[in-house]
Swiss-Prot record:
Belongs to the eukaryotic ribosomal protein eS1 family. This is Small ribosomal subunit protein eS1z. It comes from Arabidopsis thaliana (Mouse-ear cress). The gene is RPS3AA. HAMAP family: Ribosomal_eS1_euk. The lineage of its organism: Eukaryota, Viridiplantae, Streptophyta, Embryophyta, Tracheophyta. InterPro entries: Ribosomal_eS1, Ribosomal_eS1_CS, Ribosomal_eS1_euk.
Length: 262
């Protein structure tokens, strides 16, 4: 019988088992800050690997995009159907300073708006703000029945739809091109542009549920730290702990009781 190596016998591994390293031990938490146009500026926290060699932590944070509900930013549940996108532009200490980077509707809100017996009208336009941001605005609107109308349906004619769409584009261009990004976002929150469109198209066909449903930023200007700090302001008025004075009755020193037999 030939004597040779038995392949079935497994060789012992060199060295012992490697220690399991917690991946979070090499990471740091940073606070995500929203612009000052929103009521609540503390969006949340984000993780990033610590600075090691040529890999700098702040560089790994820049240009991250966070999606936040407007209800959380404004403290108003009526705005829960709006999603705001914020992009990290700079890191100051442990704060990640973000800029507005888009807006969208939740799917359930859009589905709830679409109904039968009415006409859906949509329009979109590319605009440039005074601070050189190029945006694409998407508008949505629905026809409604006139006062004292008996007929169930409220369908608009093709010529009326074209007129309404033209009005939508004109108003969106006028409102967006006359202000900077900060002021434009302030118009999105209370739906000021939608109300303006609804008022302007009243003579063509009455509309309801007029919204700027989506905003995309196509092109942003070169990064300017001064402008970013103007958008964010200072953080001296943040929600921090304050000293609480004890009431006078609690501060009264209790007299020690005499123990009999001591």
């Amino acid at each position: 019988m030939a004597v040779g190596k038995n392949k079935r016998i497994s060789k012992g591994r060199k060295g012992g088992k490697k220690k399991a390293v917690d991946p979070f031990s090499k990471k740091d938490w940073y606070d995500v800050k929203a612009p000052s146009i929103f009521t609540h500026r503390n969006v949340g926290k984000t993780l990033v690997s610590r600075t090691q060699g040529t890999k700098i932590a702040s560089e790994g944070l820049k240009h991250r995009v966070f999606e936040v509900s407007l209800a959380d930013l404004q403290g108003d549940e009526d705005n829960a159907y709006r999603k705001i996108r914020l992009r990290a532009e700079d890191v100051q200490g442990r704060n990640v300073l973000c800029q507005f980077w888009g807006m969208d509707f939740t799917t359930d809100k859009l589905r709830s708006l679409v109904k039968k017996w009415q006409t859906l009208i949509e329009a979109h336009v590319d605009v440039k703000t005074t601070d050189s941001y190029t945006l694409r605005l998407f508008c949505i609107a629905f026809t409604k029945r006139r006062a004292n109308q008996v007929k169930r349906t409220c369908y608009a004619q093709s010529s009326q739809i074209r007129q309404i769409r033209r009005k939508m584009r004109d108003i969106m261009v006028r409102e967006a091109s006359s202000c900077d990004l900060k002021d434009l976002v302030a118009k999105f929150i209370p739906e000021a542009i939608g109300r303006e469109i609804e008022k302007a198209t009243q003579g063509i066909y009455p509309l309801q549920n007029v919204f700027i449903r989506k905003v995309k930023i196509l092109k942003a200007p070169k990064f300017d730290l001064g402008k970013l700090m103007d958008v964010h302001g200072d953080y001296s008025a943040e929600d921090v702990g304050v000293k609480v004075d004890r009431p006078a009755d609690e501060m009264a020193v209790e007299e020690p009781t005499e123990i009999i037999g001591a």
